[in-house]
Regions:
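Divalent metal-coordination and catalytic microenvironments
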Residues: 3, 25, 37, 63, ...
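Active-site environment of divalent metal-dependent phosphoester hydrolases
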Residues: 42-43, 64-70, 90-91, 120-122, ...
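Surface-exposed cleft-lining segments at the edges of enzyme active sites
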Residues: 143-151
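Divalent-metal (often Zn2+) His-rich catalytic cores of metallo-beta-lactamase-fold enzymes
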Residues: 155-212
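C-terminal regulatory/interaction regions
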Residues: 207-250
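Generic beta-sheet signal
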Residues: 84-88, 136, 179
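Active-site HxH/HxHxD metal-binding segment of metal-dependent hydrolases
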Residues: 11-19, 38-111, 131
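Conserved beta-strand hairpin/beta-sheet module of binuclear metal-dependent hydrolase folds
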Residues: 1-52, 124-136, 141
């Protein structure tokens, strides 16, 4: 059994939903915890994570976006532990993270799965004992993830979704613990929905381009007309990634 706690950061918004989920994991009755995505540099939030975690063995980052990583160094220094991430710029200590790595702490095992696409450095973490995967921003608790050009790469993202789907189809993963939004108890239909949504959006972008839309903004005005305009700048970056993909470069 694994003790699992989610500490919600006070950073709600259109892109972060209710806020960033910081996950605290430990093997049942173990003394040391693994903390995934300490979140923003917000003192009260880091205090809440510390209270939930107790002794911390290591901090893991799903990716380097500030809403997940900005508080990591301060938090890790407070607990005297390392920060492990794919991108060396976000590490504290000499150990990184890569596909296939297993982080083992006092009976808890966290398996690293490379899931690039939302960002080049995106990772997911499988907790096999719970048949769960922590997905960061690759799959959210509600809505869909943004794949924003230039760091976002749609081809890689689709491959990552297929890899997560394979884990769900093989019953290695049944639930999703996301970086934002509520936990998902049935992973497979959500991942399949993400893939279907991306295919539908790509068809819509193709149609918009065929009908004369020549810029990301023009495509957004046609394809994302039902989306709150406050999200259009992010949608433009997403469309840019889709156009790169459709051009054969992404």
């Amino acid at each position: 059994m694994t003790e699992v706690r989610c500490v919600l950061a006070p950073n709600p918004g259109p892109m972060t939903l209710e806020g960033t989920n910081t996950w605290v994991l430990r093997a049942d009755v173990a003394s040391r915890a693994v903390v995934v995505d300490p979140g923003p540099l917000h003192e009260a939030h880091l205090d809440a994570v510390s209270a939930a975690a107790g002794e911390v063995a290591v901090v893991l980052l799903t990716h380097g976006h500030a809403d997940h990583s900005a508080g990591a160094e301060v938090f890790a220094e407070r607990h005297g532990c390392s920060v492990r991430a794919l991108d060396p710029a976000h590490r504290l200590g000499s150990e990184g993270l890569g596909d296939g790595d297993v982080v083992a702490v006092d009976g808890l095992e966290v398996c690293v799965v490379a899931t690039p696409g939302h960002t080049a450095d995106s990772l997911s973490f499988v907790v096999a004992a719970e048949r769960a995967v922590l997905t960061g921003d690759t799959v959210l608790g509600r809505g869909t993830a943004v794949v924003a050009h230039p760091d976002g790469h749609l081809g890689a993202y689709l491959d990552s979704l297929r890899r997560l789907r394979d884990l769900a189809e093989s019953a290695q993963v049944e639930r999703i613990w996301p970086g934002h939004g509520p936990a998902i108890e049935s992973a497979l239909p959500v991942i399949e929905g993400y893939l279907a949504h991306r295919a539908e959006r790509l068809d819509q972008v193709r149609e918009a381009v065929a009908s004369g839309a020549t810029t990301p903004r023009a495509v957004v005005e046609r394809v994302y007309a039902d989306v709150d305009p406050v999200l259009w700048p992010a949608a433009e970056q997403s469309v840019a990634a889709q156009l790169v993909y459709l051009s054969g470069w992404g």
